[in-house]
Amino acid sequence: MENFKHLPEPFRIRVIEPVKRTTREYREQAILKSGMNPFLLDSEDIFIDLLTDSGTGAVTQDMQAAMLRGDEAYSGSRSYYALAKAVKDIFGYEYTIPTHQGRGAEQIYIPVLIAKREREKGLDRSKMVVFSNYFFDTTQGHSQINGATVRNVYIKEAFDTTAKHPFKGNFDLEKLEKGIQEAGAHNVPYIVCTITCNSAGGQPVSIANLKGMYEIARKYDIPVIMDSARFAENAYFVQQREEAYKDWTIEQITYESYRYADGLAMSAKKDAMVPMGGILAFKDKSMEEVYHECRTLCVVQEGFPTYGGLEGGAMERLAVGLHDGMRQEWLAYRIAQIEYLVAGLEKIGVLCQQPGGHAAFVDAGKLLPHIPADQFPAQALSCELYKVAGIRAVEIGSFLLGRDPKTGKQLPCPAELLRLTVPRATYTQTHMDFIIEAFQKVKENAENIKGLTFTYEPKVLRHFTARLKEVE
């Protein structure tokens, strides 16, 4: 299939879900009813749903067939061992705990690692700091609930939508080490490496950067947890952009990447392609004590450690999905789809972050310069996009970042982005063209879009359930 300008989707569509079309008047009422928060819209009122790629895409025929092998035994399920083998083969990690999704893993490992640091190194909880290239929202939330101050240490190009860099997800290694020294290594219970880096625009982390980060972590005896939702997309970018790995397979790059962490926490609803599921895993004997403590906590919060909130069939499906999500031709198609969408948006003058792995990230701050950050320009843009075309997207900016839990002040956000998250094997090029046309209509009315203010603001992870209104 060489020498074609565009290749079609590398799959056949066998099952479809009808969607309804609505009127502008209907959508205006729906978004008002939802408190100007697209999270609170009913899915049946969405024409194209770009809220998330988490569990919203298609599954492969092999994944669906695998569910028939499910062993629903309460303990010792053979389906658990199928999943554990997949984790061992792909990542090289010895100890696996299934969870219902990624945040299930976070609520287990975070308090365990904090308690371990306190017990062994004398951690002072009032001075506790944790570091990441950029924390995902639930990882940040669980860290803060457990009393930690979160620090994101990213490179200067990360949020500059006018800058090009092959690995915008990279840690700023100098800032990382300086931050550890300032906090005191004993007060740093873990480092989280997010691949790809969602908040920066689905941007990858290079293996060279992973090595440097892990060297610093080893120097100060701090465990590293890989936030692994989009591990396969990260491996694809490494293959395409990091010279030393251009001839490596996705499988080889993935295995190599995970040498530079001590554990992984995964929402398997992204690159592993399942509707529900997560994984917590640890590398080797050095993390055996942590593994056993996490197993104990799993019983209380998720379920027995050999099912962790998942039925046997779901574990079988996940074991297959981990492999299916790493297919070379699949990843090439997926990244090309994002590149097509970004190119189309920029052609009509809508500035985006350079194409990442799972979404197009529109620079709402540039498109709506008249709306200040504390009136959430990306959230306002999301509401307008829904009114115009029935498209649901998600804000990645000040609204999501939230307030400092100690001072109550809005945290400064490096960019105000609107994420157009593309579910896997769900939408075609025609959908991408429709999205681009919708933005053309939004852009024509951009100066009339109003900022937003709260009518209800939760204290934690406010973006999920907050309600807002337009600023008069």
From Swiss-Prot:
Q: What is its EC number?
A: 4.1.99.1
What chemistry does it catalyse, as a reaction equation? Answer: L-tryptophan + H2O = indole + pyruvate + NH4(+)
Q: What InterPro entries does its record include?
A: ArAA_b-elim_lyase/Thr_aldolase (IPR001597), Beta-eliminating_lyase (IPR011166), PyrdxlP-dep_Trfase (IPR015424), PyrdxlP-dep_Trfase_major (IPR015421), PyrdxlP-dep_Trfase_small (IPR015422), TNase (IPR013440), Tryptophanase_CS (IPR018176)
Q: What metabolic or biological pathway is this protein involved in? A: Amino-acid degradation; L-tryptophan degradation via pyruvate pathway; indole and pyruvate from L-tryptophan: step 1/1
Name the cofactor(s).
Answer: pyridoxal 5'-phosphate
Q: Which PROSITE patterns match?
A: BETA_ELIM_LYASE
The GO terms this record gives for MF are: tryptophanase activity
| Keywords, ordered alphabetically | Lyase, Pyridoxal phosphate, Tryptophan catabolism
Residues that bear N6-(pyridoxal phosphate)lysine: K270
Q: What class of enzyme is it?
A: lyase
PANTHER family this protein is in?
Answer: BETA-ELIMINATING LYASE-LIKE PROTEIN-RELATED, TRYPTOPHANASE
Q: Which family does it belong to?
A: Belongs to the beta-eliminating lyase family.
Assembly with partners or alone: Homotetramer.
The remark listed among the other comments is: Some pathogenic strains of H.influenzae are active in tryptophan catabolism and contains tna genes which appear to have been inserted as a mobile unit.
Its recorded name reads Tryptophanase
Which species? Haemophilus influenzae
